[in-house]
Amino acid sequence: MAKWNMIPSAEGPFKGLDAMARYCFGLLYNRYQLSMRKHSEGDSRFSEVRTVRLCDAFPYRPSMRNDTSEISMSYAFCIYTQGDLAREMGCTDRTVRRCLEDLRRAGVIETKREGYNGALRFFFPPVVYEYFVREERLKEYNAILAGREG
């Protein structure tokens, strides 16, 4: 049976990342969306309360760019072991570690180790969420314009 995964194109926050790193991001983001669904249904197993500055939580909102006050927010995360990622991607653990480091450096994921020698928790910073929301709004706007012209 065929399996399809989302791989972001090399633009926006993904510019400069190689195809393997973007493929790794696609797998992580797919699992993250499942965690978000559970989180929105009230399941707290895949969420963590974090204290963040408003300017970091909402980077694309001009009114909050310089606001350094802190708030507590509930963040969803996903868990993926490096071994599982390597099997999904068809590569070695070393390649997965390199991809994760590239994604961290690009600022599109944040990680936190779950206990000693445990799996990583993957968080997606607001920059990534805002990027995808903006892209969806742009598609909707273009569809409306195309409908008016047709």
Model-flagged regions — what are they?
Residues 73, 90-91:
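Residue-level marker of alpha-helix boundaries and capping positions
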Residues 79, 89-90:
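Short, well-ordered coil↔helix boundary/capping segments
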Residues 83, 92-149:
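Winged-helix/helix-turn-helix nucleic-acid-interaction surface
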Residues 1-83:
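Short recognition helix of helix-turn-helix/winged-helix DNA-binding domains
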Residues 22-26, 91, 104:
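Functionally constrained cores in energy, signaling, and assembly domains
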Residues 1, 149-150:
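Short, Lys/Arg-enriched, disordered terminal segments
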Residues 86:
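The alpha-helix within a helix-turn-helix
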